[in-house]
Amino acid sequence: MRLPAMTVAALLTGCAASSPPPLYQWTGYQPAVYDYLKRDKDPQQQIDALEKSLQEIRAKDATPPPGFHAQLGMLYASVGKDGAAMEQFGAEKELFPESSTYMDFLMKHKTKQP
């Protein structure tokens, strides 16, 4: 009776350990969007936080989540760094082609936000 219980436990342990890695690395993105919506931090602080998160994501050889580069691009545009904004919008389009229509809109109608 003891042997079958050990076998079942070993099988369950083996199954639990084989989970796939996450598709995207969300490091710092969700808090950054929350801060943006609450307007608790100025845009440059938010840019700094997202750039740091992006470095951490790249260090793990992972992919940032959808919207990460778009958010960073909108923050760059809000502080007048249009070149950096366009670069981020382009990165979003490349990683997530389904965002192309919106990224093209932002690239065409970039405006400085209050």
For every predicted segment, state its role.
Residues 1-15:
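Sec-dependent bacterial lipoprotein signal peptides
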Residues 11-32:
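Bacterial Sec signal peptide processing site at the extreme N-terminus
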